[in-house]
Structures are given as C-alpha cells and as structure tokens.
Amino acid sequence: VSQSIEEGKVLLDEVKKTGNKVLVGHHRAYSSIMEKARNLIKSGVIGRPVAVMGSALFYKPDSYFLEGMWRTQKGGGPILLNLIHEIGNLRYLLGEVYAVQAMSSNTVRGHEVEDTSAITLQFENGVLGTFLLSDTAASSRSWEQTSQENKAYSSYEDEDCYHIAGTEGSLSIPTMRIKRYLKTEDRSWWKPFDCSVETSQRDDPLVGQIDHFCRVIRGETEPRVSVKDGLQNLMVVDCIVKAAQTGVLVQVAIIE
C-alpha cells in the first residue's frame, strides 16, 4: 500500500476525503484455498481457534539479490517483501493482531536486512501464534511451494505452511487435512482423531484479482482489500520490525 506508515495514512485520508475506490494488490485475498479455510474455521469444525503455527521458509538464489541490490538494504528484507502477505492471510483467517514479539538475524547472508525471523503473535480474540520466516532456508514450507497457485514454483502437495488448532480439532493449510473429535466428551490425547481431507480449488488468484478490479472500476462492488486493510497489514509488519529491534512486546494499533 505504501513504503511507510506515514505515507499510508496520507493515502487513507485522501480516500476518505474523495470517496474514491482504491484496491490494494494483496492477491492472496482471492485465493480459493484461503476462502475454503476461512469458511471451515467459521463453521466451527475445529471448535474455537486457540493457536496457529505458520512458516514462510524458502531459499532465494544469489541472482535474486544481484538483480536488485535494494533487496539487501533497509525495506528490502523478507519481513516487508514476504511476511506482509502472510500477515494478510492470518488476519483473514483469525482476525486482528493485537501484539507481537520477534527476533531477527542476518547471520547467514550478512545483508543490512534480516534473512531469518521468528515471530510470536497475539490476536484480539485470544489466539496465540508463532511464525518462522527465512529466505535462506532450503525448505518447502512456504505458501508458494505448497499452494500450487503459481506454477512457476516447484510445489509439494503433501506439505503445509499453516496449522490452526482449535478446541475440537485442527486444520492444516493448504492440504485441508482436518483432525477432530466427533464427540466433545471424546476430547483427550488418549483418544484417536477422526481424520479427513476437504477438497478445494487451486486457482490462480491473480486472475480473480484482476476480475475483481474490473468490477470495482465498473462500480459493481467495493474493493476486497481496501487501503485500510493494506495499511493494517503494514502496521503489523512495522510492529514486528520494532519488536525485533527492541526485544520487547509491541502492541499493534488497530485502525478504526
């Protein structure tokens, strides 16, 4: 949405003044996988969500940085470039992020910016979460390498990048594997889960995004990802950066 919180607030103020419709390009908001996961959580199949584990672990080749040295400098690390999309996903699934803690390292690449981060999140509804982020990890536990939405990436259909646990069961994403207790009185680690897999479409969300954009232009609908949404994602990420720098819990301001 913008390079800074200040610029984003200026844009939001202008949108409020003019009434113009502005669509922010968070393409995962059009993912059929995410829509399916959100509907499953809302259905109560896993009960009340209590915890989430997420990861964006991948290896960016040296050529990625040589082609754009700005990626090694402030504002070019995986927190701003990659994690912001993960935050959008988690907010879509679980609601607003209330507070964050984080640790970051640039030990492997030695760039000005981080290459690896470990993050904890507290959501407004009480859900707690952890997230691992690295662009120097030889792993497939990332959205790109599990969702199969962008065919340019190698993908592994048995891998997940999100796991959401509730009081009745758990959901792994994007495989849509569900483990749950069929009876509330059976909830015990001594008892087996009922295991199932929900089917979901794996369409290209970029197509859905441009179709939606055209509908917004024609005045047929409101932007799915507003400036407010985009700015809220940026504010969470900004708090994560501050938390990593200071080592303290940072509360996230919620835009009204």
Name these PLM-found stretches:
Residues 32-67:
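Rossmann-like NAD(P)H-binding beta-loop-alpha module
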Residues 8, 31-34, 86-87, 209-210, ...:
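A general structural signal for well-ordered alpha-helical segments in protein cores
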Residues 9-12, 17, 173-174, 212-256:
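C-terminal helix-rich "cap/oligomerization" subdomain common to oxidoreductases
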Residues 64-157, 228:
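Rossmann-like dinucleotide-binding domain that binds NAD(P)(H)
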Residues 110-114, 124-208:
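NAD(P)-dinucleotide binding in Rossmann-like oxidoreductases
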Residues 1-27, 44:
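Beta-strand-loop-alpha-helix segment that lines the small-molecule cofactor/substrate pocket
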Residues 22-24, 53, 131, 173:
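Hydrophobic residues in well-ordered beta-strands that form the structural core
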Residues 18-22, 48-50, 125-127:
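Short, well-ordered coil/turn segments that N-cap beta-strands
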